[in-house]
C-alpha cells in the first residue's frame, strides 16, 4: 500500500517538469509562476493522498527534545576533526561518536 502511494506521488511530481529557460523574460516568469502553482497543488494533493490512504499526516511528527538546560556540548581535543576523517593519515578517536560509528568502520 505504501509503495503504491509513493509511486502515485512520484508520478505526480514527474508529470510537472521544470519550465524551459527560453523565451522573453515575461514568458519565463509566467511559466515559472504557473509551474510553482502546479507544484503547490501537487504538494497539497500528495498530502491528501498520504493522510487518506495511509492514515498519517504529510507533516513530520515533531521530535521531542530535552530541555535546553540538559543539552551540553562535550568537546575535547578531537573537536573539528570529524569533517576531515578519511583524509590523509588515519585518525584514531578515543571515543567514537554514535553518529559517525557506521562511517568509521572499515
Swiss-Prot record:
Belongs to the HIV-1 REV protein family. This is Protein Rev. Homomultimer; when bound to the RRE. Multimeric assembly is essential for activity and may involve XPO1. Binds to human KPNB1, XPO1, TNPO1, RANBP5 and IPO7. Interacts with the viral Integrase. Interacts with human KHDRBS1. Interacts with human NAP1; this interaction decreases Rev multimerization and stimulates its activity. Interacts with human DEAD-box helicases DDX3 and DDX24; these interactions may serve for viral RNA export to the cytoplasm and packaging, respectively. It comes from Human immunodeficiency virus type 1 group M subtype B (isolate BRVA). GO terms for biological process: mRNA transport. Residues 26-36 have a biased composition (Basic residues). Keywords: AIDS, Host cytoplasm, Host nucleus, Host-virus interaction, Methylation, mRNA transport, Phosphoprotein, RNA-binding, Transport. The gene is rev. InterPro entries: REV_protein.
Amino acid at each position: 500500500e505504501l509503495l503504491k502511494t509513493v509511486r502515485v506521488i512520484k508520478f505526480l511530481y514527474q508529470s510537472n517538469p521544470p519550465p524551459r529557460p527560453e523565451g522573453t523574460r515575461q514568458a519565463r516568469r509566467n511559466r515559472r509562476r504557473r509551474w510553482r502553482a502546479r507544484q503547490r497543488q501537487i504538494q497539497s494533493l500528495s498530502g491528501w493522498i498520504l493522510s487518506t490512504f495511509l492514515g498519517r499526516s504529510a507533516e513530520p511528527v515533531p521530535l521531542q527534545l530535552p530541555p535546553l538546560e540538559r543539552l551540553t556540548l562535550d568537546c575535547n581535543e578531537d573537536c573539528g576533526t570529524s569533517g576531515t576523517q578519511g583524509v590523509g593519515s588515519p585518525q584514531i578517536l578515543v571515543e567514537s561518536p554514535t553518529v559517525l560509528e557506521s562511517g568509521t568502520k572499515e
